[in-house]
Amino acid sequence: MVDNSKIRVVVGMSGGVDSSVSALLLKQQGYDVVGVFMKNWDDTDDSGVCTATEDYEDVKKVADKIGIPYYSINFEKEYWHRVFEYFLDEYKKGRTPNPDVMCNSQIKFKSFLEFAMDLDADYIAMGHYAKTITDANGVTHMMRPKDGNKDQTYFLSQLSQDQIKKVIFPLANLTKPQVREIALANGLVTAKKKDSTGICFIGERNFRKFLSEFLPAKSGKMVTPEGKVVGEHAGLMYYTIGQRQGLGLGSTKESTDPWFVVGKDLKKNELIVEQGYDSPLLYASRLKASDMSFFTGKPDHDFEMHCTAKFRYRQCDIGVTVKYHADDNTVDVYFDEPARAVTPGQALVLYNGEECIGGGNIDAAFQEDKQLQLV
């Protein structure tokens, strides 16, 4: 039996079942486990309930049950400056950001990791479904977990080698139903707690109302690609490429097909819409992404490779050819087949079989040489 008692693991506990079971498993494996609850947002919800207070109460109950010390740390300032300001800035540019990716790289695996090191941690852990392996050269690789349905490598795609070397993923070889079974069998109060959804740390609230508190909305025209006015939008920031719901447009004499957002004209403050799921303006042959991050380290030379990619969570992998440019740390990604609703601001994530290679931020989508969507 391996003696882990001198290895300290600081577990980020959210008050959910996944991080609760992570802490439990590490404790059962003999590690010196410390639980820490992160407060990153003043998260009174739309009904006036402060969900952080309830979550922290659950953390305390779980920590007491499994017999570990626990603390609370406030990262609201760091979250505001490193994640939320970026989030707002992307919306101002007409893009659709993914704050969860930034939250992981800047808060959970940076601010929290630094705090854990001050607690003399050897490793940190949370409730993510991901897996790492270390090769013979001591390089750590990010891998898909057992539960493909809960795979969170997409959201971890911009972590560095230094960050993932310090992480243990206790749920790597478990499915979500198994995690709930373990929680139930061990009497954890979080066993039947529903999964959190919504923006990282901000949670489930009326998104349009929430965003309008920070960015003034400016209504404008909804137009077809030919320039015909067909309606009015409530503010470009509220819409994303490929969106169908919430446009308030009906069928026309020419077609009963539903309408979709196919672009945004920022200068004219116009939302470009077209009927039909298969609108050619929704299909890209390639994209450009920047600020690339690779788990095994930043390459020092240009390269070309064929692999698979995702440009949104829960998307099936698609075949791509990647051309990396070392001088500005960008990639041009060519799709094997035209890809629908590639959205600037979202994360591009690259895979080679079961391994997650890394990712970056999508800047633009193209149909051959024509840039789509943002004009």
Curated annotation (Swiss-Prot):
**Amino-acid positions noted as binding ATP in the UniProt annotation, renumbered to this chain:** 12-19, 38, 127
Q: Name one Pfam family in it.
A: tRNA_Me_trans
Bridged cysteine pairs (disulfide): 103-200
Q: List the GO biological process terms.
A: tRNA wobble position uridine thiolation
For this protein, the record's InterPro entries field holds: MnmA-like, MnmA-like_C, MnmA-like_central, MnmA-like_central_sf, Rossmann-like_a/b/a_fold
Its recorded reaction(s) are: S-sulfanyl-L-cysteinyl-[protein] + uridine(34) in tRNA + AH2 + ATP = 2-thiouridine(34) in tRNA + L-cysteinyl-[protein] + A + AMP + diphosphate + H(+)
Q: Name one GO cellular component term.
A: cytoplasm
Q: Where is this region: Interaction with target base in tRNA?
A: 98-100
Give the start-end ranges of region Interaction with tRNA: 150-152, 312-313
Keyword DNA-binding recorded: no
Catalytic residues, chain numbering: 103, 200
Principal place of residence = cytoplasm
One example GO MF annotation? tRNA binding
Keywords from UniProt, A to Z, are:
ATP-binding, Cytoplasm, Disulfide bond, Nucleotide-binding, RNA-binding, Transferase, tRNA processing, tRNA-binding
List the residue(s) that the UniProt entry marks as the site Interaction with tRNA.
Answer: 128, 346
Its EC number is: 2.8.1.13
Per its UniProt entry, which superkingdom is the organism in? Bacteria
List where in the cell it is found.
Cytoplasm
Homology family: Belongs to the MnmA/TRMU family.
This molecule's function is given as:
Catalyzes the 2-thiolation of uridine at the wobble position (U34) of tRNA, leading to the formation of s(2)U34.
Give the protein name, as stated in the record: tRNA-specific 2-thiouridylase MnmA
Which species expresses this protein natively?
Answer: Lactobacillus acidophilus (strain ATCC 700396 / NCK56 / N2 / NCFM)
Organism ancestry: Bacteria, Bacillati, Bacillota, Bacilli, Lactobacillales
